[in-house]
Amino acid sequence: DFSKNAETKPDNIAIVDGENGNKITYAELKEKAMEMAFLLESSGVKERDLVTITLNRGVSQIVGTLGILIAGAGYVPVGTNQPLKRAETIYKRGNIKYVVTSRTLVDKIEFPKDVKIIYTEDIQICKSIDKSKAKSDYTAYVIFTSGSTGEPKGVVIKHANACNTIVDINSRYK
């Protein structure tokens, strides 16, 4: 459990970035995630909102995802190579008004015009929130599949379901 590890093993390495080898401890990851949650709230994200995350794999993607969850919102992964038409359909079906991305990607990706862009780099200037607002019945994430019609169809996963899956995986691979 991330929160438990952040409290009991704060100096242990939580992530090793496969791209550049940078390491981040549980304490650092928690602090960055709490700052991201504050940035999201300051940008207008409310509990139970869906927020897309469009980032390359790495520390920023994990910080963004955790920040979304801590803010009590759900995340919707939208790949950096997603065609605009498919992305627009996902945004529309999910009633999504916010995207977390980086300044390096914003010029390379076309986002729907009515979506507010929140940059991961802006957590450098933020405070952090006190505690997670996530609840077991809140949406943790939505995965859009191609569906039988070829149109994106969202599958909602609640925090309780995601937690059960993680507990099961952890028990199998101890």
Segments from the language model and where they lie:
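Carrier-protein-dependent adenylate-forming modules in NRPS/ANL systems
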Residues: 1-163, 173-174
